[in-house]
Amino acid sequence: MYGKSSTRAVLLLLGIQLTALWPIAAVEIYTSRVLEAVNGTDARLKCTFSSFAPVGDALTVTWNFRPLDGGPEQFVFYYHIDPFQPMSGRFKDRVSWDGNPERYDASILLWKLQFDDNGTYTCQVKNPPDVDGVIGEIRLSVVHTVRFSEIHFLALAIGSACALMIIIVIVVVLFQHYRKKRWAERAHKVVEIKSKEEERLNQEKKVSVYLEDTD
């Protein structure tokens, strides 16, 4: 009797230790955090995730919205095997599924942006047994025109530098071509001058020979 009790105690203690050492199952969410888009355009709210468990039919994705000026949280989109769009509210007929669970992508597409779409969008992914984890957030700003960011300035600088290099290369190539053409023209003129000089000398020689013969 005592032997069975001690064995159970050891197994229970071992189970507790293994549970403590086993990593907590949690879904990691990755978003752009901040997104700026022009009024009237469409925007892709990108949300990707990682999970210890393989992706299966139990996967669920929930998108919600918190208005910038406050107010209750609003339903945006739900995915479980199939996408479920909202039947009413501000996002009715304005949101579609743009993700791929096999590629760990839970993104959605929001159409015809309006200024009252400003706010925070949350992306929650559950992939049992991975059901815990931080909810991803995207702060959307709908503007009249997109402002230049550091990336835009960097792209503009790189593009300008590339254009300048191309112009320099073209100028160098044209200059080399012009020099070769000038050298060819000069060489041709030299050959013509030499030919004319030789012809003149030959004529003079013929005249002098003729005069000698007449004498």
Curated annotation (Swiss-Prot):
Membrane topology of this protein: Single-pass type I membrane protein
Pfam families: V-set
PROSITE patterns: IG_LIKE
Extracellular compartment residues: 27-154
Transmembrane segments: 155-175
Extent of the signal sequence: 1-26
Domain Ig-like V-type intervals: 27-141
Disulphide bonds in the chain: C47-C123
Top-rank lineage group of the source organism: Eukaryota
Glycan-modified residues: N39, N118
GO cellular component: cytoskeleton; plasma membrane
GO biological process: anatomical structure morphogenesis; cell-cell adhesion; homophilic cell adhesion via plasma membrane adhesion molecules
Claim: Glycoprotein is one of the keywords in the record: yes
InterPro entries on file: Ig-like_dom, Ig-like_dom_sf, Ig-like_fold, Ig_sub, Ig_V-set, MPZL2_Ig-like_dom, Myelin_P0-rel
SMART domains: IG (SM00409), IGv (SM00406)
The UniProt record lists the keyword Membrane: yes
Intervals, Cytoplasmic compartment: 176-215
Disease note: Deafness, autosomal recessive, 111: A form of non-syndromic, sensorineural deafness characterized by early-onset, moderate to severe hearing loss with no vestibular involvement. Sensorineural deafness results from damage to the neural receptors of the inner ear, the nerve pathways to the brain, or the area of the brain that receives sound information.
Function: Mediates homophilic cell-cell adhesion.
Family in the record: Belongs to the myelin P0 protein family.
Protein name as annotated: Myelin protein zero-like protein 2
